[in-house]
Curated annotation (Swiss-Prot):
Modification sites for N-acetylmethionine: M1
GO MF term (any one): iron-sulfur cluster binding
Protein name (Swiss-Prot/TrEMBL): BolA-like protein 2
Domain of life of the native organism: Eukaryota
Protein's job: Acts as a cytosolic iron-sulfur (Fe-S) cluster assembly factor that facilitates [2Fe-2S] cluster insertion into a subset of cytosolic proteins. Acts together with the monothiol glutaredoxin GLRX3.
Keyword Nucleus recorded: yes
Localization per Swiss-Prot or TrEMBL: Cytoplasm; Nucleus
Cited InterPro entries: BOL2 (IPR045115), BolA (IPR002634), BolA-like_sf (IPR036065)
SUPFAM superfamilies assigned: BolA-like (SSF82657)
């Protein structure tokens, strides 16, 4: 499976109706097997961190077996706005 930061970004944005998504390929040689993501979505409202991460994991269920390392940060739009003001 051919993975890229752009592919993951588009899928997360579409499936989670995210207002903001950042995906960084953190592999040393950029071989697309290690990623760090930030997802901002209203779908995370009222959900604890574990449920948010499960939503992201479910969205990327087909891709995760091909990824060696995956770090995620999940925020609601309000949390994202407060974080950007810091």
């Amino acid at each position: 499976m051919e993975l890229s930061a752009e592919y993951l970004r588009e899928k997360l944005q579409r499936d989670l109706e995210a207002e903001h998504v950042e995906v960084e390929d953190t592999t040393l040689n950029r071989c697309s097997c290690s990623f760090r993501v930030l997802v901002v979505s209203a779908k995370f409202e009222g959900k604890p961190l574990l449920q948010r991460h499960r939503l992201v994991n479910a969205c990327l269920a087909e891709e995760l077996p091909h990824i060696h390392a995956f770090e995620q940060k999940t925020l609601t739009p309000d949390q994202w706005a407060r974080e950007r003001q810091k």
